[in-house]
């Protein structure tokens, strides 16, 4: 559901479309930097989700995240972005976060899985 105009608008759009659950991006899915969530927007989002009975709401993590990348810089950046996604989901009272954990690219599947698992325990 589109979050144009802010996250609370997505809840209103979901209810108008007769949806009783919702998946949103809490930030741009194609940029590393995320705008801060204003307290008023958080409060309105939580209030509308409850009031309009649009629950559960789930976030979808950024497509840039790649916890399996052999590139250390990308992997660190991905870990930080995932942490931010989880923090935003908690702040908004969301049920969870959908994540595509990434691709092992030029290495083996086993090496990529080892990096993902290692990152999950950080």
Across the structure, where does each feature detected by a protein language model lie?
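Active-site acidic/histidine proton-transfer and metal-coordination neighborhood
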Residues: 67-119
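N-terminal pre-domain/capping segments
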Residues: 1-61, 65, 69-86
């Amino acid at each position: 559901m589109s979050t144009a105009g802010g996250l609370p608008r997505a809840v209103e759009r979901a209810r108008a479309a007769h949806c009783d659950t919702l998946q949103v991006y809490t930030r741009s899915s194609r940029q590393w930097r995320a705008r801060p969530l204003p307290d008023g927007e958080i409060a309105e989002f939580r209030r509308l989700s409850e009031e309009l009975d649009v629950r559960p709401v789930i976030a979808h993590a950024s497509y840039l995240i790649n916890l399996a990348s052999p590139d250390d810089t990308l992997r660190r950046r991905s870990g930080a972005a995932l942490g931010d996604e989880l923090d935003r989901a908690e702040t908004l009272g969301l049920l969870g976060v959908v994540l595509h954990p990434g691709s092992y690219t030029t290495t083996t599947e086993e090496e990529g899985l080892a990096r993902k698992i290692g990152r999950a325990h950080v």
